[in-house]
Regions:
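Low-complexity, acidic/Ser/Thr- and charged residue-rich accessory regions of DNA metabolism proteins
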Residues: 1-2, 229, 239-299
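Non-catalytic, usually N-terminal nucleic-acid engagement modules in DNA/RNA processing proteins
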Residues: 1-54, 59, 66
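Extended two-metal-dependent nuclease catalytic cores across DNA- and RNA-processing enzymes
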Residues: 2, 24-25, 75-250
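Short, compositionally biased "basic patch" segments
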Residues: 10-12, 60-65, 80-89
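Basic, polar low-complexity surface loops/patches
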Residues: 14, 34, 46, 87-96, ...
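Generic recognition of stable, solvent-exposed alpha-helical segments in well-folded globular domains
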Residues: 33, 37, 197, 207, ...
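Glycine-rich loop at the start of a catalytic domain that most often binds anionic cofactors/ligands
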Residues: 67-72
Length: 299
């Protein structure tokens, strides 16, 4: 039976948790809504994907190679709200105290770390499950890599056929699909006014973005003009939306045993819950400790 590696897009989870959970504070005024939401999402996920091999991956501080390619990459993002910023290190602390391997690799974005680990793991016989709400990861899906789309109310599993149903193109055309549309969140320009339907139509008609470029003169109207005006930048857009699968992670993950779940230190975890006033979880942990269970999140 194949082993499963669960790769969690922690950066995506953090922002989703912050915006999904109403303001929540401790009795002395410390914000905890993102912390509570994030750890709650992990609880659901770990029940949905029972496995011994996990990594929670987050973006590093500072710029990466994409900023060298295009200095305006992510330059449009507003500053992180202070109410969230103060919760980030506490979230990281909680992940580690729960016994979940945590990765924040300097100079390498979370998606490139995840892409690289997915490729390495499948080569070693793992099935890989990527938990995210970010559509960019659809480019990694294949017979051994599955997405859990966490954007809906219930986690939705997405294989190759699921990608085609959702986006209208197969996983190996997601990069072209993204490049043609651009990405407003990451400040990656695409073809102006080219939305999902147009990108799918062009790719299905011409086979790929290269095919679209080769046939740009055949596309009529304002959208055709927009396409022709974008031809010079499209290869750069494609490079920006392509997830790397060859990052050097030899130091962080020498073997996949590095990513095996660890038994949490119950005293430290109890102290963490109590400081944050997560009383229900503290009671659950105390009860499970009395019963001799080994995992706090029902892993």
């Amino acid at each position: 039976m194949k082993k499963t590696l669960l790769l969690i897009d922690g950066s995506n989870f953090i922002f989703r948790a912050y915006h999904a959970v109403p303001p929540l504070t401790t009795s002395d005024g410390r914000p905890t809504n993102a912390i509570r939401g994030f750890l709650s999402m992990l609880r659901v996920l770990m029940k949905d994907v029972p496995t011994e091999y996990v990594a929670c991956v987050v973006d590093p501080k500072g710029k990466t190679f994409r900023s060298d390619i295009y200095p305006e990459y992510k330059a449009n993002r507003p500053p992180m709200p202070e109410e969230l910023a103060v919760q980030i290190p506490v979230i990281f602390e909680g992940v580690k105290k729960e016994g979940i391997p945590f990765l924040q690799v300097p100079g390498i974005e979370a998606d490139d770390t995840i892409g690289t680990l997915a490729k390495r793991a499948t080569a070693e016989g793992f099935t890989v499950v990527i938990a995210t709400g970010d559509k960019d990861y659809a480019q990694l899906v294949n017979e051994d890599v599955i997405l859990i789309n966490t954007m809906g109310k219930d986690n939705t599993w997405m294989n190759t056929e699921g990608v085609i149903q959702k986006f209208g193109v197969p996983p190996d055309r997601i990069i072209d699909y993204l490049a043609l549309m651009g990405d407003k969140i990451d400040n990656v320009p695409g073809v102006p006014k080219c939305g999902e339907k147009t990108a799918v139509k062009w790719i299905n008609e011409y086979g790929s973005m290269d095919g679209v470029i080769e046939n740009a003169d055949k596309i009529k109207g304002k959208i055709g003009e927009n396409l022709r005006n974008s031809l010079e930048f499209l290869p750069t857009a494609r490079a920006l939306v392509t997830i790397k699968t060859d990052a050097d992670l030899s130091e962080e993950v020498p073997t996949f045993e590095t990513l095996r779940l660890r038994e949490p230190n119950r005293e430290e975890l109890m102290d963490y819950y109590n400081k944050l006033e997560f009383r229900t979880w503290a009671r659950e942990l105390k009860k499970s400790s009395a019963a001799g269970e080994v995992k706090s999140l029902d892993f």
